[in-house]
Amino acid sequence: MLEGIVRESIGRKAAKALKRDGYLIANIYGKGLENINAAFKVNEFIKEVRKKTTLIFDVKVGSQTLSVVVVDYQKDSVTAELKHVDLKVAQKGVISKYMVPVKITGTAIGLKNKGVLIQSKRRLKVKCAAENLPNFFELDVSKLDVGDALLVRDIVVPAGVTMIDADRVAVVGVEKAR
């Protein structure tokens, strides 16, 4: 389990000092909950996020243990180091919006016919309770030829999950190479 500290002061000076000591600044929030200003060791946070198998993972901040989902993060444009992360508390029974990653499987027929596979959406926006949250959407592209595309409406959505993205939006397609 990832362990962090509660930040007492939330000013720029305090945040810089924490970053200098190897901490990642984080905000944790949820529906009906008070925001928590926290900090995690950067290396520990990266290890935890890489080894997790679900979108939801547990963190311990101070005396609280919370189940959270990564909502957003900021990276340094030059060094690509993590600067800041926003975490949302995944509360059971509370319907909330999440971003779910898209995994592509198979090799498209169109790639052999001088086509290029283009993934226009890497994450899809859904609305559901935390217990119904899928870890990813898996799309099989093996039947796609040049000019074909898989749309949001082609994705099989589990019970209790509602797609927020428009039905006609292309997720992945094969286009003719130039």
Curated annotation (Swiss-Prot):
Gene3D superfamilies, per this entry?
Ribosomal protein L25, beta domain, Ribosomal Protein L25, Chain P
Has UniProt tagged this entry with the keyword Ribosomal protein?
yes
- Write down the InterPro entries for this protein, in alphabetical order: Rbsml_bL25/Gln-tRNA_synth_N, Ribosomal_bL25/Gln-tRNA_synth, Ribosomal_bL25_b-dom, Ribosomal_bL25_C, Ribosomal_bL25_long, Ribosomal_L25_dom, Ribosomal_uL5_bac-type
The superkingdom listed in its UniProt entry is Bacteria
Mention one GO molecular function.
5S rRNA binding
Keyword field: Ribonucleoprotein, Ribosomal protein, RNA-binding, rRNA-binding
In the record, biological process GO terms are:
translation
Is Lyase there in the keyword field? no
Q: Name one GO cellular component term.
A: cytosolic large ribosomal subunit
Q: Which family does it belong to?
A: Belongs to the bacterial ribosomal protein bL25 family. CTC subfamily.
Q: Which PANTHER family match?
A: RIBOSOMAL PROTEIN L25/GLN-TRNA SYNTHETASE, ANTI-CODON-BINDING DOMAIN-CONTAINING PROTEIN, RIBOSOMAL PROTEIN L25_GLN-TRNA SYNTHETASE, ANTI-CODON-BINDING DOMAIN-CONTAINING PROTEIN
* NCBIfam families reported in the protein's UniProt record: bL25_bact_ctc, PRK05618.1-4
Q: What does this protein do?
A: This is one of the proteins that binds to the 5S RNA in the ribosome where it forms part of the central protuberance.
Oligomeric and partner information: Part of the 50S ribosomal subunit; part of the 5S rRNA/L5/L18/L25 subcomplex. Contacts the 5S rRNA. Binds to the 5S rRNA independently of L5 and L18.
Q: What is this protein called?
A: Large ribosomal subunit protein bL25
Species, as recorded: Campylobacter jejuni subsp. jejuni serotype O:23/36 (strain 81-176)
